[in-house]
Amino acid sequence: MRKATIHYLANLNQKQYLKTMKRKLCVMSAIVAAALFATDASAQTVLFKSDTVSTCYRIPALTKAKDGSIFAFTDFRPCRTDVGGGVIDVVAKRSTDNGRTWSKEQTVVKGGGDNVPFDVAHGDAAVVTDRKTGEMLMMCASGNVWYWQSTLENPNRVGRYYSKDGFNWKGEEITDQIYKLMNGAVHKLFFSSGRICQSAKIKAGKYNRIYSALCTNVGNVVLYSDDFGHNWTPLGGADARPAKFGDEAKIEELPNGDVLLCSRSQRGAGRIFNIFKYSNAKRAEGKWQTAANLDPIYKSAMCNGEVLIVNAVRKADGKKTNVLLYSVPMDAKRNYVGIYYKELASTADYASPELLTKGWKTFRLSNTDSAYSTMEQMNDGNIAFFYEETHQKGGYDMVFCSLPLDKITNGEYVAGKVKK
């Protein structure tokens, strides 16, 4: 073979080698970038930063818009205390990329109307987005009366707000409408902050049914609405008391369409579960079961949390199933927020509230003082988790993170089809 030919082939082989290596490096770079991106997505992000001087935030709430974007709401509390103690606004941020980046903070419901008692403060937001229209509903604790000092003559007030875009809200006071539902038995109440539940199965009018739990002086009262919050009705009737010693509570729809109540206890640490079993879902007929208390081996502080059921796939055998999540500080005091989880493979797993008091597994998220939390599943399958951490003289840092289901469940389950 002539030297020129050998030289040509050597150059050709070198070019091919360099081209191949370049392709491999590109692939490796993409893999590394994806890994870093995923790490960033699940990392903790302080969305609202409190301090001990002038900035005070509390109370997390989330909703997923129809386009999949996530809205995070919280109280901005110049008064550094609850509704009744001074001016409080509801503020928000939005993420369009599953929690990786966020918009600037924006006030969405403003307090400070000293001449109008209802408008002094608005907080403890409970929110939901209608899955069909994209309209958003927010229920607020409002006014200038402390919850503990509320009377029928001078009650703590209730605000209702609607929005089409998550940032511009219009609302009104509906205090009388809500108090009258319990026929005079309730003289103090508020909608539990966080996530209002919308049914995926029951539609008795234009909208799918929604549920929210009241914290009252007679324990929990669960309300439902078939017209997206314009009118509310006590589930089980005006005298129904699904958790007589319940405090702040959350609602979730069970896989068969029945209604799960998960409540903070007024009597100390722990959790109360109850289930409303429908006999006729469309007419909202049925009965609450006997409330059951969480086994005390599962530490749960006196604190608001969240409850959520997601479609899942069991990694051990690839079978579709459901996983129930509930979040709470995993301590006697407000420390170590985490998520308890358990599988609901069939109706037999939630045939009674008693069955929900045991069999939980744990995922601890926070390693310090932490309190209220809420969660929502995003369109990428991850759980949007928003919670209070690091107490700051009446406020907390409001922290967001995106959690894959397999991380929460220690590798046992992955997310199934995301509920729309």
Give each language-model segment a name.
Residues 1-44:
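Bacterial Sec-dependent N-terminal signal peptides
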Residues 42-420:
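Asp-box/BNR beta-propeller blade signature and adjacent active/binding-site loops
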